[in-house]
Amino acid sequence: MWTLALWAFSFLCKFSLAVLPTKPENISCVFYFDRNLTCTWRPEKETNDTSYIVTLTYSYGKSNYSDNATEASYSFPRSCAMPPDICSVEVQAQNGDGKVKSDITYWHLISIAKTEPPIILSVNPICNRMFQIQWKPREKTRGFPLVCMLRFRTVNSSHWTEVNFENCKQVCNLTGLQAFTEYVLALRFRFNDSRYWSKWSKEETRVTMEEVPHVLDLWRILEPADMNGDRKVRLLWKKARGAPVLEKTFGYHIQYFAENSTNLTEINNITTQQYELLLMSQAHSVSVTSFNSLGKSQEAILRIPDVHEKTFQYIKSMKAYIAEPLLVVNWQSSIPAVDTWIVEWLPEAAMSKFPALSWESVSQVTNWTIEQDKLKPFTCYNISVYPVLGHRVGEPYSIQAYAKEGTPLKGPETRVENIGLRTATITWKEIPKSARNGFINNYTVFYQAEGGKELSKTVNSHALQCDLESLTRRTSYTVWVMASTRAGGTNGVRINFKTLSISVFEIVLLTSLVGGGLLLLSIKTVTFGLRKPNRLTPLCCPDVPNPAESSLATWLGDGFKKSNMKETGNSGDTEDVVLKPCPVPADLIDKLVVNFENFLEVVLTEEAGKGQASILGGEANEYVTSPSRPDGPPGKSFKEPSVLTEVASEDSHSTCSRMADEAYSELARQPSSSCQSPGLSPPREDQAQNPYLKNSVTTREFLVHENIPEHSKGEV
């Protein structure tokens, strides 16, 4: 019992672990004519050891052929595959775990037949623009109908043109070629019912026969007319687009005449492809022909308009764009009758049209293409299209284009204007065209606050300024501008600016408020002064004390007031008043000193007492001894200090003068022996002065009389 269970378990495990081979699928067969029938299938490679048994049934099912194969491919011998038989193929895959058969596939041998490349026997030019090709297959086709394909190209071209020949014989005629042009040819073929072409034959190179030159493409460059209306016309010509590359030309003939004249001018045997004419102001007709050994070409005619003639405009719009690897120009014509166009292009930086100008004639289309490699990269070209109706040339339509764009060589030069509290205007200059390397699509303004996030704003290519808003007050910003083309952008130099802390409006507002307040205060003050003048007048115009009513006037008596009033009436130029020395007695000096000291004591005492009524001193001419001037020792004469009189004001000067005169008169009456009085010490200079006398006398000068006795001088 247990033995049977173990046997069943091992059998089930072995069955569950068995891996059958993959079923062969996608069987494909090719009948290599006169060689074998080769079939392949999938999978191409197994993970374990797998072998195949291939079975072929042929002769319309009458015969079988089987064989072993170790790979997913097998070639049946030629004896088993003879067209137009129909065969069937079956593949069985087997390994140690089992067998798997494929589905049976059926094959019509002629439909899967493939031949070897044909052999080109000869290529002969016939007439002017035709080749006759003779060829043969490598196998014996046994009369099965064939289809041929011939491909050809010119030597300097990489574009092949293919031509099919149904019910192809072993001779093919290739027509529609260009005269005197070198071509490269190749041939292949297949059975009419087959799906497989043979490989291309070996390439053959031949040249078509020569013929007379083709008509030329003719163009002109018109120079400005001089004062007489004469102008230079440069004629340009070249082979027409599509003309034979190997076309031989010996020379050119030029003919031209004025439209209002029958006088024909001819210029023969020109070997260059340009010529300069000097024509008068009227319209002319110009023709150019080329010639070789077989004859001359047709005339290329062009009309040169009158100097004052207005040309017509037949182009409504035009655009240029890049379609790798070409530059394409399209335009729209307003008149369908125009079918010929002249396209001009030259670099914008060219100093003159010739020789930098390139041109080309276009017919039957309204577009023009040129390979990008034939134009300079990063260079702006002026492209103009001229409509040609008959022999008349119309008004051109011009645009600019780049064959290849790059990033600008440098960024814009940037400035900051109109800086406000939260706004600023960024301006920049256009980049020179020589540094653009393409069309500027837009400008991007980048700005960043100090320690803040970088922000940007984009404007179109026509804008040269940008207003920044929502900035922060009193903040430093860094700003730069990037100019972008189709290829990328280039940043300009970074600059810094700082927003304002206070705006002009705020300054005006603050000034207006302060000014308005001051104006209101002034108005209120004036109004108050007009209403109550007694209160305002003492504040604005305080009373000035009258020196005549001071304590000095009280001390000197009524004589001072009268004298003061008298001197006031006789006012004069105080600057001319000078105290002059005069003959005086010998003791006059001492009396003057004593009298003046008494005067100073009285004034100082009144100032200190603030209104005391007691007045020191006696009469004006009394000789007293000043407390501040003690008597000197006997036997010594009076020392002579100098007194400087300064004229400061009319009243103070006249007062002091009168005092001196009165003192002098009093002393003159006394005996001359008074000069022998004991000397007095000089007055103290540091004593405070009366404020009413500070402008009249600032220093004192003592005058010594010339008649002082000799013994007094000796004592001094």
UniProtKB/Swiss-Prot annotation:
Residues 19-499 are extracellular. Belongs to the type I cytokine receptor family. Type 2 subfamily. This is Interleukin-31 receptor subunit alpha. Residues 1-18 form the signal peptide. One of its GO terms (molecular function) is cytokine binding. Associates with OSMR to form the interleukin-31 receptor which activates STAT3 and to a lower extent STAT1 and STAT5. May function in skin immunity. Mediates IL31-induced itch, probably in a manner dependent on cation channels TRPA1 and TRPV1. Positively regulates numbers and cycling status of immature subsets of myeloid progenitor cells in bone marrow in vivo and enhances myeloid progenitor cell survival in vitro. Induction: Up-regulated in the diseased tissues of a mouse models of allergic asthma and airway hypersensitivity. Up-regulated by IL31 in dorsal root ganglia. Up-regulated by Th2 cytokines IL4 and IL13 in macrophages. Residues 622-641, 648-696 are annotated as: Disordered. Glycans are attached at residues 36, 48, 64, 382. Keywords: Cell membrane, Cell projection, Glycoprotein, Immunity, Membrane, Receptor, Repeat, Signal, Synapse, Transmembrane, Transmembrane helix. It comes from the Eukaryota. It is found in: Cell membrane; Presynaptic cell membrane; Cell projection, Axon. Residues 23-115, 117-211, 213-304, 305-403, 408-502 form the Fibronectin type-III domain. The lineage of its organism: Eukaryota, Metazoa, Chordata, Craniata, Vertebrata. The chain crosses the membrane at residues 500-520.
